Amino acid sequence: KNYEQLSFKLKRLLRIPSNLYIWQHLEKKEIYGDGLTTSHLIDKWFEQICRKSITMGLQQRTITETKIRIVDVLEKTGRLYVPKQILNVEEAGLDYLISSEIVVIQNDRVGFVHQSILDYFMSQRMMEKYFHVQKLENIIGEKCRQTPGRRYQVQMFLQNLLEYNSEDFIIFGKEMLISDNIRYYFKYVFYEILGQIQEPDDNIIQFIIDNCENEIYGNYLLNNVIFTRKQYITILRNQGVLERWYSMEEKKSIVFNLLTSIAPNLDVEDISFIERHAFSDKSDDEQFMRCFLHDITQESDEMF
């Protein structure tokens, strides 16, 4: 019954086994809000664990310090589990986290029950470092530490940064793109998150307009963020970028490719753009024809 009341987005999130595990530990009255990402779920769960520690006669500070110590040691060693002996934490705090099923102990080795939980706490570290104005490489890590596992932590950090403030997200992303000390598949995370934004705000819109022709990463933005995504192509059209590119022989093909990539999902303004430029050049008309589907049932009245 509770599951059926959840939003579609949350149901989709819970298809991931580790997310479902976390959700099952949450108080049901807490889960119908905005917990729409893995980060939200983990944050709510740990808040709940800390809150309930008081009823067990423990101080929240003890629980938080135990968690911090575990994360510290795992980060320094680069491991998912570490010997209990080297943690040097209060036994009561560790036992409580184990009984809460967020931490596990096997053969005297301690770690979090799922790697996504460690990833989230590591992404929190990155957020703290960012607001303490640390260097880019100190936040993400040196190249030798830019592993696939670290990539997911950076992804969580960037998603949380975007949620906090899109301007900070853009500033940090631009630093990543121009840095020689960041691997490309880490830079690509920035493109991925941009591509997932359905309703770009003013900061995102301005970034796209200012950088779609950037000499360093303009083509990457076109291919990985703008292409096939109507929300971004609409921005370029509304700001006159498509019109300008159409007037430039060397860029005209980009306009054709962008419009074709969102067909048949063309709106009235897209069709008006095509109408303004159609029937003036046979070669251009052949390119515009790519926006028309062979299946007429999918075409709009405006396109006809």
How would you name each of these model-derived features?
Residues 1-144:
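Extended hydrophobic
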Residues 79, 106, 124-304:
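Extended amphipathic alpha-helical scaffold segments
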